[in-house]
């Protein structure tokens, strides 16, 4: 599994013009926007490992984690994170897991974050989403497990 993690001061996601998720950390605080990609070999153990890594990664103020600060998290699936761009000018999506594999694992990742104590908002799997964010720093990390 792969996660693109961004430290944000706010983030929201809209589907068909309707807001389906929003995080607004307390004034001066941060949250995380996490875009998640799934490949064919991923499983529930990797989803749980990725959730722990994201929740405890010390990328917020004073080298603290989202867990330390109870920072909110917005999660959205993004199959394009699995793109292979090494050849030609057209990305290959063959590494991206199909919906029947990917959707339950994104749900598992989100559930694992909640079990760890995170306040989690989500996008809608497989839908065209408009994501708005204020990236602070900027701080953007790519995490593979």
Swiss-Prot record:
<dbReference type="GO" id="GO:0106026">
    <property type="term" value="F:Gly-tRNA(Ala) deacylase activity"/>
</dbReference>
<keyword id="KW-0820">tRNA-binding</keyword>
<dbReference type="GO" id="GO:0019478">
    <property type="term" value="P:D-amino acid catabolic process"/>
</dbReference>
<dbReference type="InterPro" id="IPR023509">
    <property type="entry name" value="DTD-like_sf"/>
</dbReference>
<keyword id="KW-0694">RNA-binding</keyword>
<dbReference type="Pfam" id="PF02580">
    <property type="entry name" value="Tyr_Deacylase"/>
</dbReference>
<comment type="subunit">
    <text>Homodimer.</text>
</comment>
<dbReference type="GO" id="GO:0043908">
    <property type="term" value="F:Ser(Gly)-tRNA(Ala) hydrolase activity"/>
</dbReference>
<protein>
    <recommendedName>
        <fullName>D-aminoacyl-tRNA deacylase</fullName>
        <ecNumber>3.1.1.96</ecNumber>
    </recommendedName>
</protein>
<dbReference type="InterPro" id="IPR003732">
    <property type="entry name" value="Daa-tRNA_deacyls_DTD"/>
</dbReference>
<feature type="short sequence motif" description="Gly-cisPro motif, important for rejection of L-amino acids">
    <location>
        <begin position="137"/>
        <end position="138"/>
    </location>
</feature>
<keyword id="KW-0963">Cytoplasm</keyword>
<dbReference type="GO" id="GO:0051500">
    <property type="term" value="F:D-tyrosyl-tRNA(Tyr) deacylase activity"/>
</dbReference>
<comment type="function">
    <text>An aminoacyl-tRNA editing enzyme that deacylates mischarged D-aminoacyl-tRNAs. Also deacylates mischarged glycyl-tRNA(Ala), protecting cells against glycine mischarging by AlaRS. Acts via tRNA-based rather than protein-based catalysis; rejects L-amino acids rather than detecting D-amino acids in the active site. By recycling D-aminoacyl-tRNA to D-amino acids and free tRNA molecules, this enzyme counteracts the toxicity associated with the formation of D-aminoacyl-tRNA entities in vivo and helps enforce protein L-homochirality.</text>
</comment>
<dbReference type="GO" id="GO:0000049">
    <property type="term" value="F:tRNA binding"/>
</dbReference>
<keyword id="KW-0378">Hydrolase</keyword>
<dbReference type="GO" id="GO:0005737">
    <property type="term" value="C:cytoplasm"/>
</dbReference>
<comment type="similarity">
    <text>Belongs to the DTD family.</text>
</comment>
């Amino acid at each position: 599994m792969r996660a693109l993690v961004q430290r944000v001061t706010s983030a929201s996601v809209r589907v068909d013009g309707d807001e389906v998720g929003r995080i607004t950390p307390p004034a001066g605080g941060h949250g995380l926007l996490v875009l998640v990609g799934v490949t064919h070999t991923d499983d529930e153990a990797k989803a749980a490992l990725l959730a722990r890594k994201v929740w405890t990664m010390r990328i917020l103020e004073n080298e603290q984690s989202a867990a330390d600060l109870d920072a909110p998290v917005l999660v959205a699936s993004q199959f394009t994170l699995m793109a292979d761009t090494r050849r030609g000018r057209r990305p290959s999506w063959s590494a991206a897991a199909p919906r029947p594999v990917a959707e339950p694992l994104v749900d598992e990742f989100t559930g694992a974050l909640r079990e760890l104590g995170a306040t989690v908002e989500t996008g809608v799997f497989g839908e065209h989403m408009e994501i708005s964010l204020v990236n602070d720093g900027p701080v953007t990390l790519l995490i593979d497990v």
